[in-house]
Amino acid sequence: MTEKKRVLILEHILENPAGRVGAILDEYEIFYHLIHVGRDRLPDPTRYNAIIVLGGSAHVYDKHRYPYTVREEAYLHQAIKQGIPCLGICLGGQLLANAFKAEVKKLPKVHIGFLEIHFTEEGNRDPLSLQGLCRSPASFSMA
């Protein structure tokens, strides 16, 4: 019998649970553990096969208002160094980038929705790069 996959989901807003991510994991019968980063203790990342970091209203460049992001970035940096795949969505992507000293800067105006993504050579080789999604038509609908 094969061991069930375990995914850790890090959420930032209590009213913003796993949503579609949780539904997809449920569909594939993948166990997930959902924790709120600002409230819950971060578990040992080696207990999981992957980590998904959700969005939120925080910003990586606003650490005095969101001090938990410092701890979260260190946690994500260590998880990746231990070989655990991580996927960041919205704020989660900012946190992952910032954890590895990539430039994350404030947009001139608030943006909610989709932006075009460009991959580096290394990004193209990453199994979590979602290349197919990013090369799909410019618009699509989600249920």
Where are the predicted features?
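Cysteine-nucleophile active-site neighborhood
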Residues: 54-123
